[in-house]
From Swiss-Prot:
Lineage of producing organism: Bacteria, Pseudomonadati, Pseudomonadota, Alphaproteobacteria, Hyphomicrobiales
Biased composition (Low complexity): 925-935
Location of the region described as Disordered in the Swiss-Prot/TrEMBL record: 911-944
HD domain boundaries: 488-604
Job description of the protein: Modifies, by uridylylation and deuridylylation, the PII regulatory proteins GlnB and GlnK, in response to the nitrogen status of the cell that GlnD senses through the glutamine level. Under low glutamine levels, catalyzes the conversion of the PII proteins and UTP to PII-UMP and PPi, while under higher glutamine levels, GlnD likely hydrolyzes PII-UMP to PII and UMP (deuridylylation). Thus, controls uridylylation state and activity of the PII proteins, and plays an important role in the regulation of nitrogen metabolism.
This protein's name: Bifunctional uridylyltransferase/uridylyl-removing enzyme
Keywords: Hydrolase, Magnesium, Multifunctional enzyme, Nucleotidyltransferase, Repeat, Transferase
Pfam families in the record: ACT (PF01842), GlnD_UR_UTase (PF08335), HD (PF01966), NTP_transf_2 (PF01909)
Enzyme Commission number(s) of this protein: 2.7.7.59, 3.1.4.-
Superkingdom of this protein's organism: Bacteria
Segments for region (Uridylyl-removing): 372-727
UniProt cofactor(s): Mg(2+)
Length: 944
């Protein structure tokens, strides 16, 4: 147990005496005896674990904590065994053995882990033996432990080990605790002789395949920002796999022996020890903090664990981000160690056992030469070094290795990557400035094959961060939010991967416009460099777009780009967030939105490249972030800007275009009477006619006509659009100042995420509001049923059948994860973004019902919402409202703005409890009557 002093954890002798006293005092009272025994053992266990926790906080040693808890559990189990065989089943002493298996067998136990026990029996065990084991198990269960157990004879263990790899692995880690020790010794001896001997390759192949499947299920990257510490890539289970393989193949009892065998260097062994200790510390803290076997390092506990580790905030990086960077660097070290061990195993197998197949053996043939290369050879589809001195002779060969692998479509031999990792010191300033090295790197980056795969291998081997030190600074860097799913380096590589897919013409269904534009991009090199470097300056105090452009300017010269190419890269990085923000937070029907954006872009070539970069950036954030709705917004912004840059922006008067739209609608309703057509087209103001597509106007016409015939003051209509990934809910209702607030609240209560709102008023005083919500189901039928449920919720709230505060409260109960984040509320009020409207932009932590409360406050302030754009970035929401006062004018005056800002911030800080209680329900009058708006335009829409 690593020479630890356990005396302060538990006084074993005292505990045994206490248990014996319980037996003595309750000889004829079995029920009381059991309860008293349970109380004594539970108290000892609880106090011992608390002392282990205190020691963890004091010395920070994760393995020491796991050793302490394992030792404590050994003593509890031994005392329980002694009690059972001395006082309950006295004939069963030394009739069976109790052994630990699994992680517990390695002398390590996390606070919330299962206790895995193997009870070894003599042949033909007596019934009393089973009862003694049952007594022990029931006491352990009653103590609150999750006990995984098996009762077998030695012969049964051997037989099962031959066919069951899980049982074989468990016995491999077996450790004696108490009882008849010769049974454990016999099993260990027979296991080595009958199971292990000659089956090394089979076991190794099974364990590596098991590891790959586990990675696939947990997320096949070690850079997920909520990693599974036990099962995830680079986690404890990967280290356990190394231990199993080492013990099985090399017959080592301690991983330190791998250094003596030449498998690991002393430095690599120290990395292994540090990784093991760190991951155990994280895991123990997680279990103590949550009070359960929590294995996912989720957002809501990351901050507290970072604090427990003693991390502090530094410029550009918070304490939790620094802690998580440490975690991901450790996970990377685990990957390095895995490759090194696999390389050693292959080398050993090649020397000793010919003819192996599968994962381990690929050495039963001669290496093949690679055309045009003397430094490297091919080994069954994998690139290998021609000799061990390749990198020392010419460090450029480190970069060349990856280039040759790319152009020949080769995987990497583990030994080659091991030697790369051990040669990282050769990547110095001379190599970084070497023209040939940079030429090779640019060839890798812009490859028509699979650049992301090669870049990822370079990154995993530590080459990318050494060759581009600025990239090295963002390796393993996470951003503490719910929006970004990966570390910054993984995000950048995934961005290149998506660009490569578009470049190869494989994205037509998902990105038809980008797929069409990519072949016409004049400078692929500049675009690829911009994509790789766009977040290179994350983690700095200043704006990462500005800092990143400055970094890129230097790197472009190194990479051999021309001055013109460099300026393109610099501009793209400076503006890489612009198109996304404009598309998602601005009214794209407002001409000033388009003219302002066009002024920043200035050329069609820039527009094309910025669109493609934006798509790649959003897609690479993580699964579920990209959807068809965002694609449609970006396409709309692109087309409108392209038209303006090409000189085709329409200067035809607004009135003429509105009249033409009304005539088109009139003609489209040809099956209506002339009178009905005339009456209907007069219902709509210019904003509706100019911004709503004709096909939607026709649907609205039939919807309104049907509601009128049925005498419905309130009606809803739903449809879904799989390509745009949205579901549309149209609400017809008597107008009301708080209508949007109530609709938004009803959507929140139904669990719908609003992404856009089109708000119109008809000339007879009715509201025709269309809400776009994110699509949840892939199947149209399922999504339409969901949409109908949302529609019913809207009708129930508007008609008063349900109270809004109550239904929203049912959705707000599970907010633990978002509460882990702190986003200072901000309000920006400006008249410069639109010629007609004041734009109010709010940014804060999202929560159920927030949009409803914000729009209610705007109504309270006598502001008329003309259009709204709702955008969520994980836990953060950015809501943009285009508003006027009640007479259609922009908001002016410092006092008015200050009042709006104060009220908005109060809502965002959840201080408007009274407002929530006053949230209206049942605002629809029984008859279809409402105020008649003035003849001037009432509300504008924002369809995309």
């Amino acid at each position: 147990m690593r020479d630890l002093d356990f005396t302060n954890i538990l006084d074993v002798e005292l505990l045994q005496k206490q248990c014996d006293a319980v037996a003595e005092a309750n000889r004829n009272r079995p029920d009381v005896l059991r309860a008293d025994l349970l109380a004594v053992l539970k108290k000892a266990s609880t106090e011992g674990r608390q002392k282990a926790r205190e020691a963890l906080m004091a010395d920070g040693g994760g393995l020491n904590c796991a050793y302490r808890i394992s030792w404590l559990q050994d003593q509890i189990t031994t005392v329980l065994y002694n009690f059972a065989t001395a006082h309950i089943f006295p004939q069963q002493k030394d009739k069976f053995a109790v052994t630990a298996v699994g992680g517990y067998g390695r002398d390590t136990l996390a606070p919330g882990s299962d206790i895995d026990l193997l009870f070894l029996f003599l042949p033909r065990p007596a019934e009393e033996t089973h009862k003694a084991v049952e007594f022990m198990l029931y006491v352990l269960w009653d103590m609150g432990f999750k006990v995984g157990h098996a009762t077998r004879t030695v012969e049964e263990c051997i037989a099962l080990s031959k066919s069951d790899m899980t049982i074989r692995t468990a016995i491999l880690e077996m450790r004696y605790i108490c009882g008849l020790q010769r049974l454990e010794t016999e099993l260990e001896t027979r296991f080595d002789k009958e199971i292990v001997t000659g089956t090394g390759p089979e076991f190794i192949a099974a364990k590596l395949a098991e590891r790959d499947e586990r990675h696939r299920k947990a997320g096949d990257t070690r850079y997920l920002v909520e990693p599974n510490v036990k099962e995830g890539k680079g986690g404890l289970r990967d280290l356990h796999t190394l231990f199993w393989i080492s013990k099985y193949y090399y017959h080592v009892r301690d991983q330190a022996e791998l250094v003596k065998l030449g498998v690991l260097s002393k430095h690599e062994y120290r990395l292994l020890e540090k990784a093991d200790d760190f991951l155990w510390a994280v895991r123990c803290h997680m279990h103590f903090l949550t009070g359960k076997a929590e294995e996912r390092l989720s957002f809501d506990i990351q901050r507290e664990i970072a604090e427990a580790f003693g991390y502090h905030t530094r410029p550009g990086l918070s304490a939790v981000e620094r802690f998580m960077k440490h975690y991901f660097l450790v996970a990377k070290d685990v990957g390095d160690l895995t490759r090194i061990l696999c390389a050693a195993l292959e080398d050993q197998q090649a020397k000793s056992i010919p003819g192996l197949t599968g994962v381990i053996s690929r050495f039963t043939h001669r290496n093949r030469k690679i055309a045009g290369s003397v430094e490297f050879v091919e080994d069954r589809g994998r690139i290998a070094l021609a000799d061990p001195e390749v990198f020392k002779r010419d460090p450029v060969n480190i970069i060349r290795l990856f280039h040759v692998a790319d152009i020949n479509g080769l995987e990497f031999h583990p030994d080659a990557l091991k030697r790369v990792t051990r040669s990282l010191a050769l990547i110095d300033n001379a190599l970084r400035e070497n023209d040939e090295a940079n030429r090779l790197f640019m060839s890798i980056l812009t490859s028509k094959r699979d650049p992301a795969l090669i870049l990822r291998r370079m990154n995993e081997a530590g080459v990318l961060g050494r060759f581009i030190p600025e990239f090295g600074k963002i390796v393993a860097m996470m951003q503490f939010n719910m929006y970004h799913h990966y570390t910054v380096d993984e995000h950048l590589i995934r961005t290149v991967d998506i660009l490569s897919e578009i470049d190869k013409g494989r994205a037509e269904d998902l990105h038809p416009l980008a797929n069409k534009l990519m072949p016409g991009i004049e400078d692929r090199e500049a675009l690829y460099v911009a994509v790789l470097l766009h977040d290179i300056a994350k983690g700095r105090q200043e704006d990462h777009s500005i800092a990143g452009a400055r970094v890129a300017r230097k790197l472009c010269v190194r990479f051999g780009l021309s001055q013109k190419q460099t300026e393109i890269v610099v501009w793209l990085i400076e503006e890489h967030l612009t198109m996304s923000m404009v598309a998602q937070t601005r009214d794209l029907t407002d001409r000033k939105t388009i003219t302002d954006f066009a002024d920043r872009v200035q050329s069609l070539d820039r527009l094309k490249m910025l669109l493609i970069l934006t798509i790649c950036d959003i897609r690479a954030v993580g699964p579920g972030v990209w959807n068809g709705w965002k694609g449609q917004l970006l396409r709309t912004l692109y087309y409108e800007t392209e038209l303006l840059l090409a000189g085709g922006f329409s200067e035809v008067s607004r009135k003429e275009r509105a009249n033409a739209a009304a005539e088109a609608l009139h003609s489209a309703l040809a099956d209506w009477s002339q009178k009905d057509r005339n009456t209907y087209t007069k219902l709509h103001y210019q904003p509706y006619l100019l911004s709503v597509p004709l096909e939607d106007q026709i649907r609205h016409a039939h919807f309104i006509r049907q509601a009128d015939k049925a005498g419905q003051a309130l009606a809803t209509m739903v449809r879904t659009d799989s390509f745009h990934a949205i579901t549309e809910i149209t609400v017809l209702s008597p107008d009301h100042p708080r209508l949007l607030a109530v609709i938004a609240g009803a959507c929140a209560a139904a669990g719908a995420n609003i992404v856009d709102a089109q708000i119109f008023t008809t000339s007879d005083g009715r509201a025709l509001d269309t809400i776009h919500v994110s699509r949840e189901f892939t199947d149209d039928a399922d999504e339409l049923r969901r949409a109908a449920t949302i529609g019913r919720m809207i009708e129930d709230v508007l008609s008063g059948r349900k109270r809004l505060p109550e239904v929203i409260a049912t959705r707000a109960r599970n907010r633990k994860k978002s509460k882990a984040f702190v986003i200072p509320p901000s309000v920006n009020i400006t008249n410069s973004l639109s010629n007609k409207f004041t734009v109010i932009e709010v940014e804060c932590l999202d929560r159920p019902g927030l949009l409803s409360e914000i729009t209610a406050v705007l109504s309270d302030l006598s502001l008329d919402i003309q259009s709204a754009r709702i955008t969520t970035f994980g836990e953060k929401v950015i809501d943009t409202f285009y508003v006027t006062d009640l007479v259609g004018q922009k908001i002016s005056g410092d006092s008015k703005r200050a009042n709006i800002t104060a009220r908005m911030k109060a809502v965002m800080a959840e201080e408007e409890d009274e407002l929530r209680e006053r949230m209206p329900s049942g605002i629809i009058a029984p008859a279809a009557t409402a105020r008649t708006p003035p003849a001037s335009e009432k509300k504008a829409g924002s369809p995309i």
